[in-house]
């Protein structure tokens, strides 16, 4: 489109600025073609005329719309150019505090110079498994993308981290490796992950140093390959290093340090093991004191040394090798102190017994004389002879330094090799991810060989980067099938050819190094001759013949030739190396094993007059000329080869790029220097990426996104059903130039600037629509208002005018009369007013004059005092000003003298350089020194600033520490007060009980007290009549006091209630914490078990040929055998096989440190588990004891009577029900039988009816007989053992209870018939006392009645004794109260009248308070009674239901109809089952296999009763308990537990399986409790169920084991739930638009476009709800406890809320008003689901509260202070960090909405600064709430359970 359409009035542009690089401005008028000047308005308020370049006529860059500013991806910007990139980075870095930004495939990381809480485990978990484009930019996102692509594409990956020194490369690489270590394995064990991370401290100590730009600068490049196995777990690593800066060993610039390891050694010199090294302060050594900055602020070198040694130990470097390393490093320091003395110009010597050299030789184990000789001489070899030549002092010093550098380089390589060996794994590497931490493009004022190599490496990397970006762009275009046009991008291959091709710079440098007399000057001339004017990228400086310029991809760089040859040759004298090789110190020769080939014999360099010593040359073996050919490889050649290998590796991998940016040179946190940032953006290739993107189609929209966003630009007739065609039609009308866009298969591609143009059209359309709507509505409203006002005005005018006329006439009449009256009245009023005012004025004047006089006095006094103060202050100010002026003058004098000294120094330097040889040697040193001096000054300033900041931070830290310490003490005091309060509550309860006892005594003596009161009243009546007025006042005071007492009592009650609630909550929290800790330990234990299994499998795989006869049981069996055995003898017997297996295990290659650590950890866990188990048992006993005490409290007599009557009514109703059921059976038989059988005249019918009638008659007769016999027995017992009638129950109640007892055992009719049949079958049975056994039946009934009566009498006796004791206590308390009252009366009679009245009032107050407390106690007692009665009613209702079910089961119509042909008999119970299952011991494995291992949960859950496997297992345990078979019980339980573990390990990812076994494990646990025989668990049992209790074994220990197993299964269930729900949550809760059309769509960047995972079908909220329904139905189907289902649902909702909120906090595109509305709607749907399932009280809704508040935060207004206050009060479930993060990320979808201002966010932070919450940003999505398993007894009778044939358990039988 034309420029005139874009450059219109109010359009915003960027113009160049020398200070800010780019400055924003706004057009004041439209641009027209041909204009030479643009009228601009700057943001600071100035107007500017911007002149266009007359040659290029280029217009300034357009600025992106505000809606695009702050995007995650720079390629999402519509206008892609340098100012847009710079502004976007600045907004994100400064305003939003976001340090990461995508630029296409590049992650741009800006160093914040501040610790940020964005690298924790929670952030790693949040990014794990996510697509890169879905989350906010982060180094973890790049690492996750690499990890995911490695697993998906089976291709190795690389992460290339580059940037300037101090930009954060090393930290970024470190966090990437930490991410891999966390997601690919457990980082808490001493395995490869820890070793990979442990290599960092070692490499930092030997390869990092302090520079002027960075305190921890890496002085080498490294490429770390992290190896993974087939399961993508870290198995090892390998490190390659590049271009170590060896010169730093011997030389450091000002304010810089040598490598950290030297200073760490010096700081640790006082350690005993380091005494032999003879080290001291770092200032004592030449190699560590040159920089003058031996200490780094905030770094403790001694502690760092300890970390380094610890890392070496972890990596397997032995103590002897560590000491060897330290010996060599100490030797290097002592070597640097070796001094030389000149004998003449060409020779030197070392003083005899020179101490530094002696120490060096002693540490290195070499001969002193030999080393002394070769440090001052060198050997020159020719073809025939060898010469030994002395060297000058300068040459000797250089040789010494070269030797030190060589030793350090060899030691560095040796350490790297050992680290690689430690990281190497025997397991075959399947794939790897490489992390390249390499120096970025460098340019300084003086650039040398190091900068040349660094920039050469960056040229190669930039070429590879350009090709990769180009390839990705091409793939995207081809994938979308759009016309492919070649993008023109910078190709730096010519620059690379200039450096590395034949006769290139490196080639000429190597050739010059081979020349005998080669120098830097000759090499420079060769460069000029070869490349000058032939290569456009090579230039020569105008004023120098010893430098050259290369045009790199980032900038032109001028290199000084001086030192190139020396650094490239890296010459070390061979004789010195031979001396070191002959060392007695074994480690030293290892460093030089490869030097025979590497070091060449030195050749003669000059033919001076130096005296030579001739020796015959030794003949060389092999071919002639071999020695001449075996030249040492130069540094440049080695670097080129290693760089080629690196590029081959990178080209074979998929690269990922991280570009680190240094925002400022002063290390100020969150300070952005635009100039420095632009330099680095140009150097690191970010702008090149932008240029490549801008050359193509950077903006890309799907058709649906485009339609949703720009629907407002379409007319109704343009909208078709085909979205693609609709978009095409609209675009052709909106953008006429078809080259500006392309239509792909799924996306529309736009050129740069087109999206901004479309946004402008959209905004204009919306703005015009808004204006039109506003215009119409305002016009209509105003016209309507005008017509209404006009009508009202006319009406009002009519009435007002008439009224005014009438009033005017009346006015005229009254005016005359009023005038006369007024005349006289005014005179009177004026006269009166005058008198009053005169009198008042006189009074006022008197007071005012006195007041003014006093004020004047005080003013004079104040002025006098002020003059004295001013005198003192002015004197002090004058003295202060004088001192400051003197200080400034002295400072100026110092500066001037320093300047003069510098000038003098400069003159001296000029004079010193007059000597020609000195000039050659030290050319260029002056400039360098001046430059370094300036840098030193700047560094000093920075250092002072940092010191001040550090002091402030230390002060803040100390204050915070004190504050936290005071808080801790306060909490401890509150805890002690809570304990004291608990004790007080107990004592108060005892006092209350005592007062209750005293109450009755007080009542009995009440009459006596009343008599005393009457007498007292008579005596006081006369006194009261005399003091009536005073009495009235006292009554008022009394009422006030009463009111106050009531109020205080109320407040006290409320306070106590609040305290009780708080203490209860605190106890619950403590219990939950303890439970969570215990369950976490269980989880850790199970994880260690799994780890042990994995290690065992690996060991098994590593053993190729197993020995015969060696067999290993499963780990789960062995672990449980050793842990859960309750029989010590059997445990000892079964431990024997495991002991015999130990020697075979030792032969397997295993990391013993890992094994011992695991063993120790397991032991600790077992001990902690035992302690926690004891605590849990103790707490449970306390709870049971308290419950028992509550139940044993004597009930009120009335409640007991009601209870007995209720039981009697229940039994009567049950009897009626039995009769009704019998009648119903008759009716059903008559209705449902076949016509021929059930007809009234049918024979079968008659027989059946006759039998039923006879049975019912017999039953009635037997009942009467039983009643008579029992009554006789009771009377006999009364005669023998007489009891008090009050303690016995009525006979009718006893008999009814006996009937009930018999009903509990079985139906009376069936019992009778069963006995009758038994008597018929065995005539000789001793039970047969008469014909049909009636007497035996009666005898059994009487025995049971006798037992029942005895138990009831004992209980009545106990209750009677308790009641008598209580009455005695009350009598005693009443007596005491009576005595106290008498004493009070006696005292009151002796008091004067006033005191007597006061005492009586006090007494009355005390009496009322006591009565109030008594009433409250009675109320509480009645409430408890009501609650207990309600509970009993529920129990009886449940029993009635069970009896009804039992009756229906025992007498069913089906039993009668089964055999219609033969005569119908009454169904009889052939056998009375005892609820046990019998099996043989050899069938145990078959039982476990069929019931657990091979059981399919789905078939069991659908067709059989819930929990059937648990019931079967328990019935088997009951039978083993019945047999008293210890071993069988133990074996069955252990096999059951191990089999469940095995099933869950095999099918642990299947929700149905885990849910099924969780339900059955809990049911099994409940059965063990229900039938344990313990009173606390037997309350809800029937008498029949109580008969099924275990008799021989106490399985409490196994209950704990099963509880632990249930906890582990629950945690596994939660993990399965999380794995299933996690892919759905983000898509369903955040991304899917549940409310269509609410949220707009914004343009996306390259990351969002090129996700590593293709869309697999989006999930919606309905998907989540369907999945929740599925989970709920499965759990209900499996019969899971309702309380457990609630806990599972609560955990599910917590996972949904946590993951949704975490993604919201990490995704800027989700933080908008419309998205808040979507989230709130989705949450309401989840709440509706909870209501439908009756789970609102499960606590699940509360877990969504943080998400709800985050959604509300997105929707509320965010401008004023009131809004800030509302936000702070509303968001109490969010932490301060989360609130601030949401506000920072808030992004308007439309440009009409304003962003959240920085001032508003600061206001929020100020208001929340006192809030004490977690600083953690993300919620812990892995958190699992502690689970509890409330006891849930089963009403199912064990004897009724049938074993289905489908289970294949025919080998077990019911007993």
UniProtKB/Swiss-Prot annotation:
Residues 600-613 have a biased composition (Polar residues). One of its GO terms (biological process) is protein transport. GO terms for molecular function: actin filament binding; ATP binding; ATP hydrolysis activity; calmodulin binding; microfilament motor activity; RNA binding; small GTPase binding. Keywords: Acetylation, Actin-binding, ATP-binding, Calmodulin-binding, Coiled coil, Motor protein, Myosin, Nucleotide-binding, Phosphoprotein, Protein transport, Repeat, Transport. Detected in melanocytes. Transmembrane segments: none annotated. The modification N-acetylalanine is found at residue 2. PROSITE patterns: DILUTE, IQ, MYOSIN_MOTOR, SH3_LIKE. The modification Phosphoserine is found at residues 600, 1452, 1652. It comes from the Eukaryota. It catalyses: ATP + H2O = ADP + phosphate + H(+). It holds the Pfam family Myosin_head. ATP binds at residues 163-170. It is linked to Griscelli syndrome 1: Rare autosomal recessive disorder that results in pigmentary dilution of the skin and hair, the presence of large clumps of pigment in hair shafts, silvery-gray hair and accumulation of melanosomes in melanocytes. GS1 patients show developmental delay, hypotonia and intellectual disability, without apparent immune abnormalities. Processive actin-based motor that can move in large steps approximating the 36-nm pseudo-repeat of the actin filament. Can hydrolyze ATP in the presence of actin, which is essential for its function as a motor protein. Involved in melanosome transport. Also mediates the transport of vesicles to the plasma membrane. May also be required for some polarization process involved in dendrite formation. May be a homodimer, which associates with multiple calmodulin or myosin light chains. Interacts with RIPL2, the interaction is required for its role in dendrite formation. Interacts with MLPH. Interacts with SYTL4. Interacts with MYRIP. Interacts with RAB10; mediates the transport to the plasma membrane of SLC2A4/GLUT4 storage vesicles. Interacts with FMR1; this interaction occurs in association with polyribosome. Belongs to the TRAFAC class myosin-kinesin ATPase superfamily. Myosin family. This is Unconventional myosin-Va. It comes from Homo sapiens.
